[in-house]
Amino acid sequence: MIKNLIFDLGGVIMTIDQNEALRRFKELGVADIERRLDPYTQTGIFGDVEEGKVTAEEFRAELSRIVGRTLSFDDCKYGWLGYRKEVPQRNLDALRRLRGEGYRLILLSNTNPFMMSWALTKDFDGGTGSLEDYFYALYLSYRIGVMKPDAKFFQAVIDNEHILPEESLFVDDGPRNIEAARKLGFNTMCPKNGEDWPQALMEMLAK
């Protein structure tokens, strides 16, 4: 029986726009941004800020060095928020319904302070609630110090929340993340970015 629902943010709860993120960082002056950004797991300074190896300020300073001019926190935030295409209302409605039905909702996301400076405010859903209002717990890579698909990230959730993988469903759009979760015994679902997944999830839970 499924008791716990563990969701990814980008590509699941939030529809992402990789091309817009690339465009914005190019606009900021990062000429080789295509080799620095990935839809699932970042590398270099972009990976370091998502893994918590550098702070938001250190990221800002390094990106300023890369582009040859001083960038502000808001400049960096502007770039990262290029990923945010929309948070579909159907997804928010599904989260509310599932929480109301007694499921324990947990977020497990590779993310960074710039993205969270938006998501942890009421701007997340258009003015009524922040990301925190929809979940029992948030596991954010830059706070935990590890990124998916590393098994340590999943193990942190298992240990801290005292959950059993076989009683948990992990929903993520990244195939490598899904594979890592399966190896630990999680039930999984892998919708594509922007897919209308709530109905399929409800049907899966009803079985």
Predicted features along the sequence, with ranges:
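Asp-based, Mg2+/Mn2+-dependent phosphohydrolase catalytic module
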Residues: M1-K3, F7, N112-P113, W118-K207
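N-terminal helical cap/lid subdomain that shapes the substrate entry/recognition surface
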Residues: I2-D93, G100-E101, N112-M116
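A structural alpha-helix within SAM-dependent methyltransferase catalytic domains
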Residues: R96-R99, I158
